[in-house]
């Protein structure tokens, strides 16, 4: 039972990861995944917010923080099988607000979800 008496119980880690890696490259992600595999740790991914479903946290896990993966690239005339036209390549740490700003600069439309307090899925 939760109380306001600090001597009434133990302080625990709770449902949070015990390790975290703030990645800024693909090689950092590869190293983190290998560490989690070798240490038999649950792996969770955290981008720019949190998930109400708990996907961005987990007791005893290794959390990979992708917030610094900010690559954002615009392709005005992408040509691939089945599609021809403008496109964007968006890194895992780019916020929807940043995507919208880039789309506005490039005079294109971008569709995404946004929630001012957390990642909304």
Task: Name each region found by the language model.
Residues 1-121:
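N-terminal accessory segments
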